[in-house]
């Protein structure tokens, strides 16, 4: 292995002084780590990346959660008020089918 490194341009020759060819062989005998999935995903599944920024997406989610709570509280107040108040829509008294006198 020293013959292979001979002739290469280096600034500090001591960088290669501790190199031993035996250590390379021992390291290559190890089996590489392999990822084994725990779930089975369909092969036709398409992975799509989101175009929005992660920070913007997070802020929108927080804003939606905050507004959902406010909206829910407002709906409860309106529901309580509707039971005692008359309906907002009132039936029309004049019928559009009747011709007007001119």
From Swiss-Prot:
List all membrane-crossing ranges.
Answer: none
Q: Which organism is it from?
A: Mus musculus (Mouse)
> What is annotated about its quaternary structure and interactions?
Component of numerous DCX (DDB1-CUL4-X-box) E3 ubiquitin-protein ligase complexes which consist of a core of DDB1, cullin-4 (CUL4A or CUL4B), DDA1 and RBX1. Component of the DCX(DCAF15) complex, also named CLR4(DCAF15) complex, composed of DCAF15, DDB1, cullin-4 (CUL4A or CUL4B), DDA1 and RBX1. Part of the DDD core complex containing DET1, DDA1 and DDB1; the DDD core complex recruits a specific UBE2E enzyme, such as UBE2E1, UBE2E2 UBE2E3, to form specific DDD-E2 complexes.
Residues bearing Phosphoserine are 33, 95
| InterPro entries according to UniProt | DDA1-like, DDA1_dom
Give the protein's recorded name.
DET1- and DDB1-associated protein 1
Residue positions of the PTM N-acetylalanine?
2
Keyword terms, alphabetized: Acetylation, Phosphoprotein, Ubl conjugation pathway
Gene name tied to this protein: Dda1
Please, one GO biological process term? protein polyubiquitination
What does the UniProt function comment say about this protein?
Answer: Functions as a component of numerous distinct DCX (DDB1-CUL4-X-box) E3 ubiquitin-protein ligase complexes which mediate the ubiquitination and subsequent proteasomal degradation of target proteins. In the DCX complexes, acts as a scaffolding subunit required to stabilize the complex.
What family is reported? Belongs to the DDA1 family.
A Pfam family found in this protein is: DDA1
Asked whether the keyword Flavoprotein is assigned, the reply is no
Which portions of the sequence form the region Disordered? Answer: 67-102
Pathway stated in the Swiss-Prot or TrEMBL entry: Protein modification; protein ubiquitination
Q: Which GO terms describe its cellular component?
A: Cul4-RING E3 ubiquitin ligase complex
Organism domain of life: Eukaryota
Q: Respond yes or no to whether keyword ATP-binding is given for this record.
A: no
């Amino acid at each position: 292995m020293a013959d292979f490194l001979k002739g290469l341009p280096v600034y500090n020759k001591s960088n290669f002084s501790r190199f031993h060819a035996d250590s390379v062989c021992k390291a290559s005998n190890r089996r590489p780590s392999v990822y084994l999935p725990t779930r089975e995903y369909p092969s036709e599944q398409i992975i799509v990346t989101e175009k929005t920024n992660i920070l913007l997406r997070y802020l929108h989610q927080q804003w939606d959660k905050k507004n959902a709570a406010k909206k829910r509280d407002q709906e409860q107040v309106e529901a309580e008020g509707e039971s005692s108040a008359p309906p907002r829509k009132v039936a029309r008294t004049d019928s559009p089918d009747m011709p007007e006198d001119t």
